[in-house]
Amino acid sequence: MRPLAIITGAGSGIGKALTLRLAEKNVDVIAVGRRISKLESTQKENPARIKIVQADVGNDDGREKIVKAIPSGQTLKYLVHNAAVLDPVIPLSRININDWRIHQAINVEGPLFLTQKLLPSINGGRILHISSGAAHHPYSGWGAYSTSKAALYMLYLVLREELKDSDIRIGSIRPGVVDTPMQDKIREVPESDFPALQKFINLKEQNKLSAPSIVAKFISWILLETADDEFSAREWDIRDESHQEFWMED
C-alpha cells in the first residue's frame, strides 16, 4: 500500500506545491485547507493521488474531520504542518485579542492538537513543522506571527525530546522567503505598520523569492530521503548550501 501524507494549508503556495510533488512521488495525499475552491484546483492536477478535506486546523471540529479522512487500513507516514496566518500585520501595541488568538489557534494549537490526535496513526512516520525565520528574528508588525512561530519551533524541540524513544520522528524546516499569496499580502501593508516593507518589495522586484515548487523539492527530499537521525537533528534551512546538491538537481 502506498504511503499516506497529510498536508495542511494545501490550497496554495508551499502546501499546494508539496502536495503535487509528493503525489508525483507515488504518495497518497490528504490535502487540507479552508477554501474548497483552492483545494479542488490542487486535486484536479492529480485526482488519483490527492484527496481533499475542507477543514480549519484552528478548531477541534476541523482537526477531527482530518482524522476521520484517513482511509481504513492505511498508515499515515507523513504529517506536514504548513497552514499558517500572518494577517494582520500590525504593531503589538494595537493588535486586538481576537486576532492574537487566531494566530495562536492556527499557527500553534493547530499543529499541537492535530499531532496529538494523529500520533496513534503514525507508525514509524514523520511529522514536519514549516517554520520561519520570523521564529528567530523580530520584525516590527509581525509580533503575533513571530511569537506563534517561535512557539511552533519550541513545540518541535519538546516533541523531539518526548518522542525520542518512539518510532516517530519530528522535524522542522525554514523555507526562506517564498513567492506565495502570503508574500503578496505582505507587500500591501502600510510601511507605518511594517517598517521592513521595502526589503520585501525589493526581494520581489529583484526576483529573489523562491518558487513554491523549489521549496517543495527541498521538503520532499527531507521527508522521503533523509535518515531518521538527520531528519530530527536540527531545523533545516533551505539556504544552507551543504545539502543543496542532494535535492536541487532532482
Language-model features: locations:
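Conserved glycine-rich cofactor-binding loop
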Residues: 11-12
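Conserved glycine-rich Rossmann-like NAD(P)H-binding loop of the short-chain dehydrogenase/reductase
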Residues: 27-40
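Conserved NAD(P)H cofactor-binding loop of Rossmann-fold oxidoreductase domains
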Residues: 82-88
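Substrate-binding pocket helix/loop in short-chain dehydrogenase/reductase
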Residues: 90-92, 99-101
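Active-site helix of classical SDR
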Residues: 115, 148
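Residue(s) in the substrate-gating loop at a strand-loop-helix junction
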Residues: 132
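C-terminal helical subdomain
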Residues: 172, 180, 191-246
